[in-house]
């Protein structure tokens, strides 16, 4: 294990005088005391070698056979037992130096062993990073956390939080804690509810985010706020999302514009990348891409810019096409998108069949394509195109022999998303550089969208964002053309955070909600406390809240968020180690004035 930043070389107490990973030749011939876990035990022809591990690393102990009592103690030890040892530091011979260990130039000749805790047989080995089921790892998380990789992940997370605090405090941010027990919020996910004993029938909610509190702090006169904030959302797990609980670097600033916030966050990510990793940022300052452009070019509002493929709009080439599918879409005002894979025109039929299956999973009726072989274009739809169309397409997309072009056609947003899904699917064809961090800002999100099912205009994203153009835009523009001061920060296809310049003016807020069909009375009922505060003097303000867990994932090259959280839940939102969630006693339910009304299936299971 790597040494822990900021750890002293020595710590005098009855358990130890030094740390295992900090012993080196400077301590040769000195008597020291170390304590930790038995990582490995090896018996080599009369000598017993023990690798002793603490949170700084490993050192090698030697027990000599002439010390019979010590030898018997060592023979009886199990791996992962906790021992305290005193002994003399000696230099290793040149041929036995272990360059993999920080303490690899020395070893400790043991003079005394005290067993603090003898370990029982383990459900899985700690020393060897063998494949272990996730269920076992989560049930015995305290053991799993001893393993080198995940142990270092948690150390890394701790150091990163310290760096975040230092960076923000140097820029006049103040760390302020906001309530955990609060009221239900409009963030969008399901709340975790907490019943009130003192107020029967009423419930607190765990915060999905400290959104309203941090805005009220700006109204309270605090200029720059941050918090390593726990957030609670009752939503399903994903590889990059933990069910139930997660942490974010929550930030808010008064009297700022969008560019001010971008400068702060870009600087922080650059600092963390350079200080905490060997990765490199592709472009600094981070590129800014409008929502419309990012969907047109990448088919996703969280694009991985490392993928060397872009989507092209070729609608105008097929306005009067002899291919009825394309011509019909252009007449209906739909779009036609194309994506070129360089050098993949000679793949097997299986390659194209698999790609079509993926397109259908994404919601497409199929996947049209043209292969450009040396002898000419081939494919199921080539026969439908005129020679002029084929030539125009080749020139427009700069197609060469050996390439293949995939097509999508239909309504703009749906077609963009399907093509974006295919772009992501084809990313496996490329060796993406894991040490490259391709950040970007996605900006200029639409304020509103049309809900086809409800047949009405709805907010597209955050209803509390300031519309670009403010009141004038709301009063003079088509709602579907209004843009919001809202932004996402994305890295390598992972959305780290959304943020916005807030709507701090009640008159604009009422008007914005009115366009989405909300009456003033309903707005007052749901957000009256915010509007009341804004009516008493609210500064322009904005913020963002990058996901801490996701940031650690990226910097540590982890594919699953559970690898960077000390005690995560499983995908079913269960804590296998603590057996949560769990039933509670009838007395606890009575104290909370609660009765259970379980689903019928569950009731049957209880009776059986």
UniProtKB/Swiss-Prot annotation:
Gene Ontology terms: biological process: aspartyl-tRNA aminoacylation
InterPro entries xrefs: Aa-tRNA-synt_II, aa-tRNA-synth_II, aa-tRNA-synth_II/BPL/LPL, Asp-tRNA-ligase_1, Asp-tRNA-ligase_1_N, Asp/Asn-tRNA-synth_IIb, AspRS_core, GAD-like_sf
Superkingdom per UniProt: Bacteria
Catalytic activity: tRNA(Asx) + L-aspartate + ATP = L-aspartyl-tRNA(Asx) + AMP + diphosphate
EC numbers: 6.1.1.23
EC main group: ligase
GO MF term (any one): nucleic acid binding
Gene Ontology CC: one annotated term: cytoplasm
Site (Important for tRNA non-discrimination): 44
Keyword ATP-binding in annotation: yes
UniProt similarity note: Belongs to the class-II aminoacyl-tRNA synthetase family. Type 1 subfamily.
Protein name: Aspartate--tRNA(Asp/Asn) ligase
Organism per entry: Chlorobium phaeobacteroides (strain BS1)
């Amino acid at each position: 294990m790597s040494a822990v930043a900021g750890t002293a070389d020595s710590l005098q107490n009855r358990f130890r005088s030094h740390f295992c990973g900090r012993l080196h030749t400077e301590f040769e011939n000195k008597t020291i005391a170390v304590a930790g876990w038995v990582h490995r035990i090896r018996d080599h022809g009369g000598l017993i070698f023990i690798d002793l591990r603490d949170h700084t690393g490993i050192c090698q102990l030697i027990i000599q056979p002439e010390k019979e009592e010590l030898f018997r103690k060592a023979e009886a030890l199990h791996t992962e037992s906790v021992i305290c040892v005193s002994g003399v530091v000696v230099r290793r011979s040149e041929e036995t130096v272990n360059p993999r260990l920080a303490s690899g130039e020395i070893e400790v000749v043991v003079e005394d062993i005290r067993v603090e805790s003898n370990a029982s047989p383990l459900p899985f080995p700690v020393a060897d990073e063998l494949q272990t089921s996730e269920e076992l790892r989560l049930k015995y998380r305290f053991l799993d956390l001893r393993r080198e990789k995940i142990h270092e992940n948690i150390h890394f997370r701790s150091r990163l939080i310290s760096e975040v605090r230092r960076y923000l405090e140097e820029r006049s941010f103040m760390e302020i804690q906001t309530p955990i027990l609060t009221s239900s919020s409009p963030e969008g996910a399901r709340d975790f509810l907490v019943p009130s004993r003192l107020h029967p029938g009423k419930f607190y909610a765990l915060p999905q985010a400290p959104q309203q509190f941090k805005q009220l702090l700006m109204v309270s006169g605090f200029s720059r706020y941050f918090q390593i904030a726990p957030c609670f959302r009752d939503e399903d797990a994903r590889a990059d999302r933990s069910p139930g609980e997660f942490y974010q670097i929550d930030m808010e600033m008064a009297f700022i514009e969008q560019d001010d916030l971008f400068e702060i966050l870009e600087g922080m990510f650059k600092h963390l990348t350079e200080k905490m990793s060997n990765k490199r940022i592709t472009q600094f300052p981070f590129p800014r891409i409008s929502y419309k452009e990012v969907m047109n070019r990448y088919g996703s509002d969280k694009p991985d810019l490392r993928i060397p493929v872009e989507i092209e709009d070729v609608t105008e080439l097929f306005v009067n096409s002899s291919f009825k599918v394309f011509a019909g879409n252009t007449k209906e005002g739909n779009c036609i998108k194309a994506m070129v894979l360089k050098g993949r025109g000679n793949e097997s039929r299986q390659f194209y069949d698999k790609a079509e299956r993926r397109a259908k999973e994404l919601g497409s009726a199929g996947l049209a394509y043209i292969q450009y072989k040396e002898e000419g274009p081939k494919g199921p739809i080539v026969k439908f195109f005129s020679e002029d169309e084929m030539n125009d397409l080749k020139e427009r997309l700069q197609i060469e022999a050996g390439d293949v072009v995939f097509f999508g056609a239909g309504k703009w947003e749906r077609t963009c998303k399907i093509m974006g899904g295919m772009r992501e699917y084809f990313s496996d064809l490329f060796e993406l550089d894991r040490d490259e961090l391709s950040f970007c800002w996605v900006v200029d999100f639409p304020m509103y969208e049309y809900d086809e099912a409800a047949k009405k205009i709805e907010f597209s994203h955050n209803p509390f964002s300031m519309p670009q153009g403010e009141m004038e835009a709301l009063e003079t523009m088509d709602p579907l053309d209004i843009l919001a001061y809202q932004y996402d920060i994305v890295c390598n296809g992972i959305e780290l955070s959304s943020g916005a310049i807030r709507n701090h003016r009640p008159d604009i807020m009422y008007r914005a909600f009115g366009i989405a069909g909300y009456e003033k009375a309903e707005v007052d009922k749901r957000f009256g406390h915010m509007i009341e505060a804004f009516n008493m003097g609210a500064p322009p303000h904005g913020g963002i809240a990058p996901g801490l867990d996701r940031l650690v994932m990226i910097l540590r090259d982890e594919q699953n968020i559970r690898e960077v959280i000390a005690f995560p839940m499983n995908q079913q939102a269960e804590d296998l180690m603590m057996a949560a969630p769990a039933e509670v006693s009838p007395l606890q339910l009575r104290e909370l004035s609660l009765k259970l009304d379980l689903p019928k299936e569950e009731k049957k299971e209880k009776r059986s």
